[in-house]
Amino acid sequence: MITIEQLLDILKKDHNFREVLDADGYHYHYQGFSFERLSYDSRQVDGKTLFFAKGATFKADYLKEAITNGLQLYISEVDYELGIPVVLVTDIKKAMSLIAMAFYGNPQEKLKLLAFTGTKGKTTAAYFAYHMLKESYKPAMFSTMNTTLDGKTFFKSQLTTPESLDLFAMMAECVTNGMTHLIMEVSSQAYLVDRVYGLTFDVGVFLNISPDHIGPIEHPTFEDYFYHKRLLMENSRAVVINSGMDHFSFLADQVADQEHVFYGPLSDNQITTSQAFSFEAKGQLAGHYDIQLIGHFNQENAMAAGLACLRLGASLADIQKGIAKTRVPGRMEVLTMTNHAKVFVDYAHNGDSLEKLLSVVEEHQTGKLMLILGAPGNKGESRRADFGRVIHQHPNLTVILTADDPNFEDPEDISKEIASHIARPVEIISDREQAIQKAMSLCQGAKDAVIIAGKGADAYQIVKGQQVAYAGDLAIAKHYL
């Protein structure tokens, strides 16, 4: 429960309070209300709900519906003049985060918090950390792929970083379940829209940066994207940073006065020997590590997670066992066809991660390589040119472009846009299952491979704003082995 007095005190301390408006006019103080629930969904309110009117598409009709369900007061940046009191604020998203934090009893203070950011590798690194910490502790995890609040039950995540009301409700459930640590992926979008406003992490990890999520509804420029990524460093007590990433010198200067550790080529924490399924490291993680996920970049993700978990109480033995046990749904999953050709299913969904994926496969498969690829509609438009650039640099690839969450766009138009950046003919088959079947039918022997990129373990396609059932890349590939 939270009272109106407590609510106003939080807003005033954050300099986010304007006034309370009701039929009697303006009020600096207010009383007589307490709330047992928080909501930003007008369909889920009653007389004891504190409702947040948020979003560029919010309509007064939503508020009218909530009032008919018993709503007595709301928080907003706008007075909709509907006859009930409104708490007016300058920034509704910041208000949501701080009020949710207090409402749920500050659960962040009862968990050790580890956050990963980066253009690629967040989910893989989070899974490594989860398995490392699980050896001696009780970690919960919020990742793009899956969420677990009790270490036993996993459910599909809707957002990389949940909305603040959901985030703190889930954190509180983690505390109730006896969890000791929480591992999170923190997206640039989470900082752009203040989902984690006011939250301080025990350790923040910056894996890498490359242009992505740049478009009309995301970040307008790379500078804006990079800036919002860096906010995790400002909001972490200690940081772990990849010294091999672009703009590392800037980040090194930024974190000079806080606890930090670097890994990679310009640090003492390096991979000294790399094999397909093992690596040797020097520095704080000195030793031998077995790993199921192929690729040097996955070994670097394991290093990042290991250094972070070392700060959170994990032993070197915990880290070794955790790395050896880690598998990630939809990340570098490998199938073998009856003719011994390989099928790689991976979530690679931007130019940088696609380049890494192709390079790893080319190390191991020297025959005909087939790539199945698409790009999402109505977001991350810059990826399309990036995909074309990467494909152009791999001339031996046979490419089939297909649908990947086309949303409100025509998947064929998206494919044609990608194709416009490739200086050789490519095939377009918009039906993703047909594209996979066609590619697999062209493989003839053990040196050949099909690379299915983009959707990973997702068992749906986003079409016209809705999740439409889709068997999933892995299930389809298994069917045609």
Swiss-Prot record:
Enzyme class: ligase
UniProt temperature dependence: Optimum temperature is 28 degrees Celsius.
N6-carboxylysine modification, residue list: K229
Nucleotide-binding is among the record's keywords: yes
Protein's pathway: Cell wall biogenesis; peptidoglycan biosynthesis
Binding site for ATP: G118, T119, K120, G121, K122, T123, T124
UniProt EC number: 6.3.2.7
GO CC, any one term: cytoplasm
Binding site for UDP-N-acetyl-alpha-D-muramoyl-L-alanyl-D-glutamate: S42, Q158, T160, T161, S187, R195
Disulfide bridge positions per record: none
Major site of localization recorded for this protein: cytoplasm
Entry GO MF terms: ATP binding; magnesium ion binding; UDP-N-acetylmuramoyl-L-alanyl-D-glutamate-L-lysine ligase activity
Protein name: UDP-N-acetylmuramoyl-L-alanyl-D-glutamate--L-lysine ligase
Gene: murE
